[in-house]
Amino acid sequence: MRFFSYLGLLLAGLASLQGFSTDNPLEEELRCWCLYVKNCRFCWACQDGLCKNKVLKDMPPVQEHSYPMEYCMLHRQCKYITDGPIFQVECTMQTCDAIRLLNA
């Protein structure tokens, strides 16, 4: 019986991800995405070939179409690095949810 409870929770979580697009996340989700996953294209505002992070204002600008800009689009993954491990999250998964899964 417990199995079905877990299965139901898992399916409910997956259903909430349906239709989620990393092309243009909601403004209130940007902070969660971009604090931990700085390499996602939507975290950056670009003008004249230079891009500034929308959330991390103290980050230096990067060139448009550089590695951080294109990683998510090419590999369908967003990536962030901590002192030891490298965490990769599929672009279709909300970062906050992925962090909870990694820490579980």
UniProtKB/Swiss-Prot annotation:
Keyword Manganese: no
Domain of life: Viruses
UniProt cross-references to Pfam families, sorted A to Z: v110
Keyword Signal: yes
UniProt keyword annotations, A-Z: Early protein, Signal
Coiled coil: none
Induction info: Expressed in the early phase of the viral replicative cycle.
Leader sequence residues: 1-19
Family statement drawn from the similarity comment of this UniProt entry: Belongs to the asfivirus MGF 110 family.
Described purpose of this protein according to its UniProt entry: Plays a role in virus cell tropism, and may be required for efficient virus replication in macrophages.
Protein name per the record: Protein MGF 110-2L
